[in-house]
Each structure stands twice: as C-alpha cells, then as structure tokens.
Amino acid sequence: MAKEPVRVLVTGAAGNQEPILVKEESVVGIPTPLLKLKSWQWWVLVSVNIFFLIGGQAASVLLGRFYYDEGGNSKWMATLVQTAAFPILYIPLLLLPSSASVESSESSCSLKYIVLIYVLLGVIIAGDNMLYSVGLLYLSASTYSLICATQLAFNAVFSYFINAQKFTALILNSVVLLSFSAALIALNDDADTPSGVSRSKYIVGFVCTLAASALYSLLLSLMQFSFEKILKRETFSVVLEMQIYTSLVATCVSVIGLFASGEWRTLHGEMEGYHKGQASYVLTLVWTAVTWQVCSVGVVGLIFLVTSLFSNVISTLSLAVTPLAALVVFRDKMSGVKIMAMLIAIWGFASYVYQNHIDDLKVRQARQQAQAGRVEPPC
C-alpha cells in the first residue's frame, strides 16, 4: 500500500489554508527531483521565478505604453498580445512526467465541467485584459501601475465572500490604505497623462483600470474556488493547464473582438505609420506577448514552489517597481501626490505581508509542536 503523501497547510494572510512545498515531504503531483532539492537550490528557483514575475510584468506594462506612445491605437491588439504567447507554457508542461494521479483527477471531475470552467474563466480574462488595455491607453505607466496595486485590496474582499477567508485588523488596514492610494490618484488635479488625453479620458482610464483590478481579483478567487471545490487539487500541472487553456479561450475571444470591431482593417496603416518603423512595431507586439508569458511562468512557478497567496503578493510588489521603471524609461512625472500614493500603497502592501508572516509563524509553531509530541516517548 502506497504511503499517503504529506500535505502541509499554511494559513495565509486572509486565513486561507494552502499547500506549501516542503523539500523533505512528498506532495501530490510534484516531480520527485524537486523534492530532493537542497535549501539553497530551492531559494534559487524561488528567486528566479520572482525575477520572472517582477521583470515580466514591468516589461510588459512598459512595452504596452511604448506601443501606444509610438502610434499604436488598437485596443483589441493590445488585449490579444496579453495571452497570445500562451504556447510557451507548454514547455514546462511537457517537461512534467505523466502520472496516474493526474489522470485520476481528470476522471473525478466531468470533462464538460472542466471545459465550462476554462471557457468562463477565459472569457473573464479577455474582458479583464480589454479593461487593462483601455486603462493603459489613457494613463501613464506609473499611474496605471499604482491603480493596479488595489488588486490586493479587492482580493481580500472577494476572498472573504467567495473563499470564506478571515478579515483581520491588518488586512482591513491594508484594504483602507490601498483604497486611499487609489483615491489620491483619482483626485489628483496635476495628473500626468499621455499627449492628447483629455481629463474625461483620464477618468475613463482610471475607472477601467480600477475595474480591471477588481475583475482580476475576482478571477483569482474564482480560480481558487475551482481548485478547492471542483477540480479539488492544486498541483503544478493542473495550475499550468488552467493557465494554458484559459489563455487559449481568452486569445480566441480577443481575435473575435479584433475582427468584429473592425480594428483589423486599421492594423496595416497602423504598422506603416508606427513612429519607430514597421520592424519595431512587430517586435514591440512580439516582445509584449513574450514578457506577459514570462510573467505567467513566474506566477505559476511561485504557486508551485510556495503558495498562490505568495505569488499574488509578489505580483502586487512588482506594481511598485513599474512606476520607478517608467520614471527612468519614459520620464514619467512623479508629483508629490503620486509619491504619497505610492508610499501609502507600499504601507498597505507591508501590512498585508506582515499578517501573512504572523499566520505563517503560528502554523509553523503548531506543526513543530505536533512533530515534537510524536517524537517524545510517553512518560
């Protein structure tokens, strides 16, 4: 009889229990070589995935802003490139050894339900990407990133209602601070906007970006709900498959939108009129698509190596890096209000992380006490 794998549950910042990878323990669906990693090797992998996530997200936002600045104007094309390079994710998926455990998970959940989940989530992703594209069209890269940081606050709210997670004082503090940060950006009369963008379009961009952040957080909660209640497993292969097939659906929706809106007719003229030339136009779109998938690899990798909560927190941290990168690349204006908003957002982020740290310590201490109790001989 096979030994039952050990699953260590770590309580996240919002009270949610999630599996965390521990080197010495056997976890369902995780390749054996990974379990044999030494501590420094595990940290190297975590660091590489953090770099992929932060670097990929910052680069994709900057390239998206560059596309608009240099003459690009197709919102559906900007939406399409956010998921179009999803075949890259087949590389790590194909490297995973096939196992009976994966097959049993598929048989435990009807194929039609899995397809329905992927289609619904894919459509939501496409709509979310469109909102992000509109937001980036009317906002500077730094302002856009600061508003996107509110996704952590929305995530706490949706997790409370959908995933039954706790709402602690520190989490509430984080939600309030991130809300204040977004409000400062919204009320900033000295807001820097791309050339030709009116105040009304700035407001549209703000609302679309805020709505996109909320929708993205809802998407994360729905994915977590799908893993826990329907798929009933969260292994690397299952997470990666969801990322691939939802991106496939989102890409199809974006292509349909591109043709249905008639924007495809303007693409040739857009490429010819691109300020940096036609080659630069193609390379900008290609590298935007690639960097978004590099970001996705980082997200999935951190879910695999640590937890989905940690992956989301690092994703939010990367949004604080983008304004600094935009300051260097695009010379974005950093007004006093924007600096204050960024500091408040970092404070809210730190509050969220600290709550996660406290909960993590409690679970680790409880686990150590339980292990010590099993080892000690009876008196």
From Swiss-Prot:
**Its GO biological process terms?**
purine nucleobase transport
Matching InterPro entries: PUP_plant (IPR030182)
Where is this gene product found?
Membrane
Q: One MF term in GO for this entry?
A: purine nucleobase transmembrane transporter activity
Q: Which UniProt keywords apply?
A: Membrane, Transmembrane, Transmembrane helix, Transport
Cite a single Pfam family from the UniProt record. PUNUT
Tell me which GO cellular component terms the UniProt record holds: membrane
Q: How is the protein disposed in the membrane?
A: Multi-pass membrane protein
Which spans are transmembrane here? 43-63, 76-96, 114-134, 144-164, 167-187, 203-223, 239-259, 294-313, 314-330, 334-354
Subunit composition? May form a complex with the potassium channel subunit KAT1.
Family, according to the entry, reads as follows:
Belongs to the purine permeases (TC 2.A.7.14) family.
What is the protein's given name? Answer: Probable purine permease 11
Organism, as annotated: Arabidopsis thaliana (Mouse-ear cress)
Q: Which gene encodes it?
A: PUP11
